[in-house]
């Protein structure tokens, strides 16, 4: 099992909570941590932008990434949501096994 940490941002805690609950309820993520108080700076449509955002730290397995990404894109209010996956190369083995045990591959 190859575990991933997926990073995504949302415009509010309410949106982040909806995304997190959906991913966990659908067994696409073992855990989603929400961090408020993020400030993002980026260029959008030729203009410099600064926005307050909420960061989602999504723990899942690699085999679920495409389904997770599809679900995030379908529910996300952003035109181009941030969805970045980082492979977890090392970790506490019982935690990594837990990720595998509570997530379910699509049928």
Question: Model segments located where?
Answer:
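Positively charged, small/polar-rich N-terminal and surface patches that mediate targeting and assembly
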Residues: 1-107
């Amino acid at each position: 099992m190859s575990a991933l940490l997926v990073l995504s941002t949302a415009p509010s805690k309410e949106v982040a909570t909806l995304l997190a609950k959906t991913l966990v309820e659908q067994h696409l993520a073992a855990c989603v941590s929400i961090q408020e108080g993020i400030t993002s700076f980026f260029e959008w449509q030729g203009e410099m932008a600064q926005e307050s955002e909420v960061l989602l730290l999504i723990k899942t397995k690699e085999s679920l990434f495409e389904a997770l990404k599809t679900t995030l894109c379908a529910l996300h209010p952003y035109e181009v949501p941030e969805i970045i996956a980082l492979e977890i190369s090392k970790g506490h083995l019982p935690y990594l096994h837990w990720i595998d045990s509570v997530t379910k591959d699509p049928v």
